[in-house]
Each structure stands twice: as C-alpha cells, then as structure tokens.
From Swiss-Prot:
GO terms for cellular component: extracellular region. It comes from the Eukaryota. Interacts with host CD4. Interacts with host DC-SIGN (CD209). Interacts with Borrelia outer surface protein C (OspC). Residues 1-21 form the signal peptide. It comes from Ixodes persulcatus (Taiga tick). Belongs to the salp15 family. Expressed in salivary glands. Induction: By feeding. By the presence of Borrelia burgdorferi. InterPro entries: Salp15 (IPR021971). Its main location: secreted. Residues 119-138 are annotated as: CD4-binding. This is Salivary protein 15 Iper-3.
Length: 138
C-alpha cells in the first residue's frame, strides 16, 4: 500500500513538472511574439495632430533615450543591457519632456529636441513659454 501511495506522489510530481515546463515554453513564445509585434510598421502613436510625422518623432525620442542610457552606463558600473523604451502616453508637449525607460525598474525624464513642435501654431520646444501641450479629446 505504501508503494502505491509513493507511486501516486511521483506521478503527481511528474505531472506538475510537465505542466510547469509547458507553461514556461508558452510564456517564452508569447514574449518573443510580443517583441516581434513592436517591430510592425502599423503602430498608432497618440501624439497631437500638430506633430507632422509621429513615427519620426518617436524614433528621435528613442534615439535620445538610447544615447542617454549609453552615457549613464559609461558613468556607472550598471549592466549595459540594450533595453530602452519610450511610451507615447508619457510625452508631455506642454513641458517638452518625455519618459525614457532604461530597465524594467528604472525611468528617467528627458527633454525633447528644441525643434519639436509643441503647439498647433508652429510653436517649438525651443521657446518653452509658448508650448500648449496636448488636451485629450481636442
């Protein structure tokens, strides 16, 4: 009888291991699919209408974010992983800043380039007092 119980325990343990391995493989597949999705060209950016080329601005901000990460890595002993990201929800056209994510737990607020439009009448971030920002729903 004891061997029967021991055999049940072993079978249940093996079953849990199989399920855990399968779940891990599924999670890795979903992660790689999510990474592939970010490279698609049909991403809709939520920038104001006065931004003539949202994708170009996003790429410029991403480059600034990347360069900032590189300079921080040269000043510190932190790992030099290639992770950096921006989120169009955290681009502030009134205060000409954007949030740059360096690691999953490390963010920094950076300034947008001075030639970035920050208002519907051709205002640029170089003259910060004229920036109007983006009002949702307008």
């Amino acid at each position: 009888m004891e061997s029967f119980v021991a055999m049940k325990v072993v079978c249940i343990t093996v079953l849990f291991v199989i399920v855990a391995v399968n779940e891990s493989a599924t999670s890795e597949a979903n992660t790689s699919n999510a990474a592939k999705d970010t490279k698609k060209t049909n991403v809709t950016l939520q920038f104001p209408n006065y931004i003539p080329n949202p994708k170009q601005l996003a790429l410029k901000l991403l480059e600034i974010c990347k360069n900032n990460k590189s300079s921080l890595n040269s000043l510190t002993a932190r790992s030099s992983t290639n992770y950096y990201a921006i989120n169009d929800k955290y681009v502030d056209f009134k205060y000409y800043t954007f949030l740059c994510k360096h690691d999953k737990d490390r963010n920094v607020t950076l300034n947008m380039p001075p030639d970035t439009p920050c208002g519907p009448n051709g205002q640029k971030c170089a003259n910060k007092s004229q920036c109007v920002g983006h009002i949702p729903g307008c």
